Amino acid sequence: MTSSATSPTNGVDKNKNEEMVATPANCPYQLFNQEVVWNGKWIQTRQVGFKTHTGQVGVWQSVHRNTKPVEASADGVSIIARVRKQGKLYIVLVKQYRIPCGKLCLELPAGLIDAGETAQQAAIRELKEETGYVSGKVVMESKLCFLDPGLTDDSQCLVVVDVDGDAPENQNPVQVLDSTESIEVLLVEQSALMAYVTNLDSSSIVVESTLLAYAMGIQFATI
C-alpha cells in the first residue's frame, strides 16, 4: 500500500523532522521516519516515509511477523509432498477456513520455522503435524521467496518431499494439530491437479497462490 501524493492526507507529517533510514545502494528512494504503528503478539505494522528522485513524497505501510527466529532462512515453509501410492502420483493438499479471507482455502501444507530448525526439518515436521504423512526424503529446497512483497516481508522456502504412500506408517495418517487448528487433508492426483483447482466453487473456497502457481506449472509443462 502506498501513496506518492504530496497532499497532507498521504500520511507524511510535514512538520516532523526527517530522520533518514539507511537503505541499500539499489534502492531508488530516500527513506525516512520509519516507525512501528502497532505491535501485536504475532505481527507488527510499520510505516516509513519515502521520497522519489523527482521529489515526490509518500508513505509506505507494511506488515511484519514477530515470530521469525534470527537464524532462520525464512519465516516459514510450503511443502510440495508427492505421494506415490499403488502406482499413482498424488499431491497432498490441506483445506482450512482462513478468517482474513472469510472463506475456506485450499493450500499446500505449510508452517513457520521454529528456532533451531532448518527449512527442511520444518517441512518434515509440519507435514506430519498437518497431514499425518511421514517423509524422510527431501527432494529439493527452493531459495528464499516473498509472498506479497508490496505488503509484507513474510517469506518462505518451498520444500519438495517424497512420501511412500504404501509404507505402513502412511496407511492411516494421523494429524498432530494444535488445539486451534481445523485442517482437512486431501490427496489429489498430480495429473488432475489443475482440473481439480479450476472446478472449485470460488464462492465458498479460494486457492492459495503458491498452490495455484504449482498447478499451473504442471499444466503448462504438458502444453
Curated annotation (Swiss-Prot):
GO terms for cellular component: nucleus. Mg(2+) binds at residues 126, 130. Residues 72-213 form the Nudix hydrolase domain. It holds the Pfam family NUDIX. Keywords: Hydrolase, Magnesium, Manganese, Metal-binding. The keyword Magnesium applies. A motif (Nudix box) lies at residues 111-132. Probably mediates the hydrolysis of some nucleoside diphosphate derivatives. PANTHER family: ADP-SUGAR PYROPHOSPHATASE (PTHR11839:SF1), UDP/ADP-SUGAR PYROPHOSPHATASE (PTHR11839). This is Putative nudix hydrolase 2. It comes from Caenorhabditis elegans.
